[in-house]
Amino acid sequence: MPAESIPDVCLKDEVARSEHPVLIIDGMNLFVRCYCAYPAVSSHGYQLGGMLGFIKTLTRLSNDLVPRGIVIAWEGGGSQRRRALYPDYKMNRRPEKLNRFYQDDIPDSDENRLHQNVALIKLLKHVPVWQVYADCCEGDDIIAHIVNCQLVNRNVIIGSSDKDMHQLLNARVRQYSFHKKRVLTADDVYAEYGILAENFGIAKAVCGDPTDNVPGVPRIGFKTLTKHIPLLRCEATVLDDVLKYAASHRQSSLPCARIWADEQLVRRNWELVKLDISSLPAARSAQITSVLSADAPALDIVGVCQILADEGTSNLNVSELTTTFARYAGCRIM
């Protein structure tokens, strides 16, 4: 499978009105996707698809989306707050598997994946991008913090296939889906789900999220929800208003009665699915501000080549990488 290919339609036309948005990459989301799908083996016989696929995808996105700068947001160990609230949170996740194997070996060990992730982070330190993470926070929470607290005056494109990002979309924030290979807007979320993007988190709190092992109200899906609680598709709202609406209509609507009866489940789910910027410690927030306020570092192509040599690969177009990323050296996003 090639690196995340961009469809023939020119994405530059889609993002033209953004006037060079900041591109924020959900680092682990893209890395795991490339790790599972991209076939690349080093001269040492080890898998390198995660690292090489990530760099090639980042290069392609940079050329097609033409951002003013690139931020990579990494997982910081997951959310202790969510696990304390619901111990089964994300416990259904299976280890990532390669979708291919060579001879009789299936080289999908955690050790190899971790090695690639560390090597990728080291390589990116030689590239004009900003890398950020926060202890005990998930990557999407960090992205929400950057979008809503750090880059409040910037247009943003979030690179992620995670539907949780839908709740961040508005006039200045869009999402590039690695899965759909296109830029998504708040209007696209409404067209697909019949729900305003800013209400997407509330809808997930009611319907649940099987991906994260979060159970919803029984027999309530998105279509049923929007039919019986129309305010989700009409206006930006808050969870309390949705629950009040369900309570006031429980006699005439069985779905509303179910939501009303499961109020505590819905409230717990809301704490699980909302992108929480309040859990970020002040010291870590200040550190992220410091990182994003700095000029982008210079491109150290010698350092990049050294890491590639150490990993036993020359499977990157260094000339293209230089042309793509040299323009970001010294740029600012804050």
Predicted regions and their residues:
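Noncatalytic, basic helical substrate-engagement surface that gates or grips nucleic-acid strands
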Residues: 2-9, 13-159, 165-183, 274, ...
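Non-catalytic nucleic-acid-binding/docking modules located in mid-to-C-terminal regions
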Residues: 2-8, 12-19, 60, 64-74, ...
